[in-house]
Amino acid sequence: MRHYEIVFMVHPDQSEQVPGMIERYTGSVKEAGGQIHRLEDWGRRQLAYPINKLHKAHYVLMNVEAPQEVIDELETTFRYNDAVLRNVIIRTKHAVTEASPMAKAKDERKVAVAEVETNNFEDAEE
């Protein structure tokens, strides 16, 4: 089986459907004997340029190891799902399991906010 990186963008009005879509797509990969190495829901983000007069979209990143048949099925599903604005599927040489730069930056911000809140709480006690 080959390794793939999949990114798809969902219409912002359909953001509540994203967890169901992720579950469906990961389920089809696992049913075929594949593996999900990384799954990141980046949430609603600003687009670099408008697509269908939209300025935001809900982004999802998946790194999977799957047979070609599953990837073909996912491509077809993306093509006929009106909620999916854009998608890209790239074959990679190795499984990518580390967090993406987007996820790392998000985690660093959470840690920084937690430290600031802790410092403010300690200052208030004194």
Swiss-Prot record:
Keywords from the named record: Ribonucleoprotein, Ribosomal protein, RNA-binding, rRNA-binding
Protein's UniProt name: Small ribosomal subunit protein bS6
Biological role stated in the UniProt entry: Binds together with bS18 to 16S ribosomal RNA.
Species of the source: Actinobacillus succinogenes (strain ATCC 55618 / DSM 22257 / CCUG 43843 / 130Z)
Keyword rRNA-binding: yes
Cystines in this chain: none
Entry similarity comment: Belongs to the bacterial ribosomal protein bS6 family.
GO process annotations (BP): translation
Molecular-function annotations in GO: small ribosomal subunit rRNA binding; structural constituent of ribosome
Cellular compartments per GO CC: cytosolic small ribosomal subunit
Keyword Ribonucleoprotein (UniProt): yes
Alphabetized PROSITE patterns for the sequence: RIBOSOMAL_S6
Domain of life: Bacteria
